[in-house]
Swiss-Prot record:
Enzyme class (EC, first level): isomerase
NCBIfam families: hisT_truA
Lineage: Bacteria, Pseudomonadati, Coprothermobacterota, Coprothermobacteria, Coprothermobacterales
Name the UniProt record assigns to this protein: tRNA pseudouridine synthase A
Stored PANTHER family: PSEUDOURIDYLATE SYNTHASE, TRNA PSEUDOURIDINE SYNTHASE-LIKE 1
Originating gene: truA
Length: 259
């Protein structure tokens, strides 16, 4: 058996998040069941971080021990033949036994998408529907800037987390408004349980006039707690930066000089 690293793209609408559940409705349950069938033995995966129910991912890093007689490309082909249509493996590479996608994750990007009008069956599951509410865009942008930097984000987290520290650093927070749609992007060195949805919910409350821009300062200073979590379906895990990055190393190893 050798160790492989993969990137899993999934639509989270029908799942209870990524982390394995007793009732078997999580993405990890489905992925491990499929890998176990191919390996002819029980197979577990380790991944870069859990996601809530309904959250989508463009590329979740995971690792597993797999049959050596199958190439990385063959693993990807077989997995995509067996996994349900709302999951797709977009990369598989052989990696070192020491590689751990959780310990190697140095930064992540989340994107939150919201709309004030129905977009139709192709897009509705990927946007949070927030109808008929006017929003003060300048207030949202001003509030978003306050989130950038290193802070104690405990007030932007849900109960149930056992992390040692609630300090995180956000490198970039951007907000874009176009027609009836809103996009919130966050890049940081880590995120607490429920943190992104609570930040988006607070920014929306500020835009709706239900909170003042300075409410952000109150939460970050520990004098208030965010209490509105935006719906899960608008949240996307876009990218996880890894050091070392086995996918980048694989690309470099296969580069050719055509000069």
């Amino acid at each position: 058996m050798v160790k492989y690293a993969g990137l899993l793209q999934f639509k989270g609408t029908n799942y209870a998040g990524f982390q394995r559940q007793k009732n078997g409705t999580a993405i990890q349950n489905v992925l491990e069941s499929t890998l176990s069938q191919i390996n002819n033995r029980a197979t577990v995966v380790r991944y870069s971080g859990r996601t809530d129910a309904g959250v989508h991912a463009w590329g979740m890093p995971f690792v597993f021990w797999g049959r050596e007689d199958l190439s990385a490309d063959k693993w990807m082909f077989i997995l995509n033949r067996m996994l349900p249509k709302d999951m797709r493996v977009i990369s598989v590479v052989r990696t070192s036994p020491e590689f751990d996608p959780q310990l190697s994750a140095v930064a992540k990007q989340y994107l939150y998408c919201a709309t004030q009008e129905r977009l139709g069956p192709l897009w509705d599951d990927f946007f949070a529907y927030l109808p008929n509410l006017s929003i003060e865009t300048s207030a949202v942008i001003s509030a978003a800037r306050k989130l950038v930097g290193e802070h104690d984000f405990k007030g932007f987290s849900k109960k149930g987390s056992s992390v040692k520290s609630t300090r995180r650093k956000l490198y970039e927070v951007s907000v874009m408004f176009t027609h009836s749609r809103m996009y919130f992007s966050f890049v940081g060195n880590g995120f607490l349980y429920g943190m992104v949805r609570l930040m988006v919910g607070t920014l929306l409350q500020i835009g709706w006039g239900k909170q003042d821009v300075n409410f952000i300062d109150e939460v970050l200073s520990g004098n208030a707690v965010a209490n509105y979590s935006a719906p899960a379906q608008g949240l996307h895990l876009v990218k996880v930066w890894l050091e070392p990055d086995p996918f980048l190393e694989s690309v470099k190893a296969n580069e050719r000089d055509f000069s």
